[in-house]
Amino acid sequence: MKKRGFILKNGLTTKKVNGKNYDFPTTMVTAVENCRKAGIHGNCTWIMAYPGETLEHLKTSVAFIKWQQDFWTEGLSPQSDQYKINHAGVNAKMFTATAYPGTEMWNVVRSDLQDHFDISFDKTGHPVCDDNFHNYVLELDDATKILNNKDGDPVNFGEMPMKTFLKCREHVDSGEIEKILEM
């Protein structure tokens, strides 16, 4: 199996979030639990719209964020300052998957780069450093935003329909990621 996100079933831990069971990588759950035991607040970073990502995959990421919020606020009064600090301390922001030159993702979405940005490649597979490539690199200024193609249309490298992707991104940007779980 290539690096495609496959995880052996015994490498998963089931946790209930908003009344539904989700399977999370045991290493991630254990890391969060060990951080609390050590008095450290770890920070997970999230990326959405990777090639192959579906809405169900994104829901699992969102559920893990919500599980962390519940974990860090367990036993605290929602009105308390400590609850608010712990809840806000869980990173609920997400980057949008971005194909940077030289990365594995760049190679995976090469045909999309040609279609969306008119990027050309030489016979060795390297991008031709012309105006199209330069404009693409300028578009990479902020990985939290949605890339727009040469026509100004949004680009989604994942498997979600564009309308779904844009709605999810809207929920992330508005700080209402829990709404993704309801989609």
Predicted segments, located by residue:
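A structural motif corresponding to the C-terminal lobe/cap of the Radical SAM core domain
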Residues: 1-183
